[in-house]
């Protein structure tokens, strides 16, 4: 039997506000345990929550970017459950009236473009965390994270492979960091993924029983967890068993999922409207202001890069992976006047060098103006592509040097003396009679071999196009 995997994602996006969603306590990461736990997070008697306006503004931003419906009346609900890191005994969330509904997000997997529908995004507070290490067998409670504002973004179950799920998660991660509503730091828990996975026979309309894998904090773990869980469910069904609805944990060391608890449904949490919070009403004026302040989105910018700078759609997608990358490209392309060549160098040599050194673009020793200067020298014929790579390496090692100084110091000037190049061509032709005969017999590959010999003789300083033209003229 052929099986189909069905995946929906619930992604917790931690909003990068300075204070918490219902109190003025700091959201700064890495403080001493409970340093940022206010009377609200500690649930002391008589304290009341006060809504953080910035949370609503950031939620609207995401809704607009997802081309979603934004509900202008928002009600908060209590999600009741007992856990030590939740002193109130309930989490404030949104059940029936989420701030964002019916959005969509485009993903690219290989050559395929697919739109995933976003069911909803709702505002809620994060819980604290239990600490088990270094307490001699006891468990401590750290409430620093409690009350941190979250947007839980829920997709439709429209992904059919781990690759599609990873592409969706990456697309949302890119979008929330682009909008500057989340820092995207997965290691610190700013972007956490829960994956709902089920399987069904290919062609069956009805969904299988889903299991939810909680708190996946890397794209690699997301892919591994989904693949393992899908295979595990298929094995259960093929052995004649039934998949039980459950909440799962992923063990990255073993690369497998395991049951944490049997899954609860919404009614198990006894949701009801929070009596301490009035409905949040978003005015038409607030909506207009939010629309006016929206930045150019990645898809729009990518289309503009194709139109204005002549780059391919593929390159445009890479260049708009982050706002920093897009800004770097636009600065370098404008300064050099060479959009396509700039894109090639950014997505090629520069990306490879950053990856090798484990560096961010912001820390690159080759700034946008320096890359523009290099690209300009390639465009005007001063540097061949081979010499340009040597110049790039020197620029990386010598961040203060100008391109002119690099060319002078390392002797990278491309040969412009036609007579000198012609003499080299004559010598190579005289010493490679066999290749000459092969070319005259119609073997185009022989021409490349002859050009290669001339480039070797010139130590890479001759212009390959000029060399090729000279050879063809002499052998015509």
From Swiss-Prot:
It comes from Neisseria meningitidis serogroup B (strain ATCC BAA-335 / MC58). It holds the Pfam family GatB_Yqey. SUPFAM superfamilies: GatB/YqeY motif, Glutamine synthetase/guanido kinase. GO terms for molecular function: asparaginyl-tRNA synthase (glutamine-hydrolyzing) activity; ATP binding; glutaminyl-tRNA synthase (glutamine-hydrolyzing) activity. InterPro entries: Asn/Gln-tRNA_amidoTrfase_suB/E, Asn/Gln-tRNA_Trfase_suB/E_cat, Asn/Gln_amidotransferase, Asn/Gln_tRNA_amidoTrase-B-like, GatB, GatB_C_1, GatB_Yqey_C_2, Gln-tRNA_amidoTrfase_suB_CS. Keywords: ATP-binding, Ligase, Nucleotide-binding, Protein biosynthesis. Allows the formation of correctly charged Asn-tRNA(Asn) or Gln-tRNA(Gln) through the transamidation of misacylated Asp-tRNA(Asn) or Glu-tRNA(Gln) in organisms which lack either or both of asparaginyl-tRNA or glutaminyl-tRNA synthetases. The reaction takes place in the presence of glutamine and ATP through an activated phospho-Asp-tRNA(Asn) or phospho-Glu-tRNA(Gln). It comes from the Bacteria. Heterotrimer of A, B and C subunits. This is Aspartyl/glutamyl-tRNA(Asn/Gln) amidotransferase subunit B. Belongs to the GatB/GatE family. GatB subfamily.
């Amino acid at each position: 039997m052929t099986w189909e995997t069905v995946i929906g994602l619930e992604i917790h996006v931690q909003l990068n506000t300075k204070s918490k969603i219902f109190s003025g306590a700091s959201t700064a990461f890495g403080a001493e345990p409970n340093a940022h736990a206010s009377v609200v997070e500690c649930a002391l008697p008589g304290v009341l929550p006060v809504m953080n306006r910035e949370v609503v503004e950031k939620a609207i931003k995401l809704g607009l970017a997802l081309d979603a419906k934004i509900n202008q009346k928002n009600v908060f609900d209590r999600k009741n459950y007992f856990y030590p890191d939740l002193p109130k005994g309930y989490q404030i969330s949104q059940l029936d009236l989420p701030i964002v509904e019916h959005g969509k997000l485009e993903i690219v997997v290989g050559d395929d473009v697919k739109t995933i529908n976003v069911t909803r995004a709702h505002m809620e507070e994060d819980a604290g965390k239990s600490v088990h290490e270094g307490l001699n067998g006891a468990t401590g409670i750290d409430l620093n994270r409690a009350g941190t504002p979250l947007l839980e973004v829920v997709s439709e179950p429209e992904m059919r492979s781990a690759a599609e799920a990873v592409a969706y998660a990456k697309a949302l991660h890119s979008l929330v960091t682009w909008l500057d509503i989340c820092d995207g730091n997965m290691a610190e828990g700013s972007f956490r993924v829960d994956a709902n996975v089920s399987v069904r026979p290919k062609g069956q309309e009805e969904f299988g029983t889903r299991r939810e894998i909680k708190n996946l904090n890397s794209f690699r773990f997301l892919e591994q967890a989904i693949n393992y869980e899908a295979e595990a469910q298929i094995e259960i069904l093929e052995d004649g068993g039934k998949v039980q609805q459950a909440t799962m944990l992923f063990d990255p060391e073993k690369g497998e999922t395991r049951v944490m608890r049997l899954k609860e449904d919404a009614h198990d949490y006894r949701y009801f409207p929070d009596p301490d919070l009035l409905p949040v009403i978003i005015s038409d004026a607030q909506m207009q202001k939010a629309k006016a302040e929206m930045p150019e989105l990645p898809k729009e910018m990518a289309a503009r890069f194709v139109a204005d700078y002549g780059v391919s759609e593929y390159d445009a997608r890479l260049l708009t992976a982050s706002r920093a990358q897009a800004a770097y490209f636009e600065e370098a392309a404008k300064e050099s006047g060479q959009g396509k060549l700039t894109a090639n160098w950014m997505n090629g040599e520069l990306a490879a060098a950053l990856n090798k050194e484990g560096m961010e673009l912001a820390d690159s020793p080759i700034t946008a103006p320096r890359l523009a200067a290099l690209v300009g020298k390639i465009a005007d014929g001063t540097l061949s592509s081979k010499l340009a790579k040597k110049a790039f390496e020197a620029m990386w090692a010598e961040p203060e040097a100008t391109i002119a100084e690099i060319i002078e110091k390392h002797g990278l000037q491309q040969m412009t003396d036609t007579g000198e190049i012609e003499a080299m061509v004559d010598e190579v032709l005289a010493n490679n009679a066999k290749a000459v005969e092969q070319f005259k017999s119609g073997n185009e590959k022989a021409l490349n071999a002859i050009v290669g010999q001339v480039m070797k003789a010139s130590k890479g300083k001759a212009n390959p196009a000029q060399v090729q033209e000279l050879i063809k003229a002499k052998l015509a």
